[in-house]
């Protein structure tokens, strides 16, 4: 029991030291990511109404790549002034349909039949 507690304390102390004396570029990079995420959230809060924001957060749990595409689309529309009012849930559904159509993958099935030597023609009776 004492060994486990000692090991936990060592890990905690090591984590503190790494955080304190860690790579300064890493901390700056994390700060930049944090600021970017904060900026995205503030723009989306201005552009989306409450129900659309809830739908987008639910979608983020299931399909994060599609959510990122929709967020980028909304931010781009907001920057270019193409949104005259807040996007409702129905508007978000329409945008989701557009993004789905653009990223839709078509699957094709290709049959590769084996060519078998037919020995019926060569039968000598």
UniProtKB/Swiss-Prot annotation:
Matching Gene3D superfamilies: PDCD5-like
Stored InterPro entries: PDCD5-like, PDCD5-like_sf
Tagged with keyword Nucleotide-binding: no
Assigned GO CC terms: cytoplasm; cytosol; extracellular exosome; nucleus
In-chain residues carrying the UniProt-annotated modification N6-acetyllysine: 63
GO molecular function: acetyltransferase activator activity; beta-tubulin binding; DNA binding; heparin binding
Role: May function in the process of apoptosis.
Record's protein name: Programmed cell death protein 5
Organism: Homo sapiens
Origin organism lineage: Eukaryota, Metazoa, Chordata, Craniata, Vertebrata
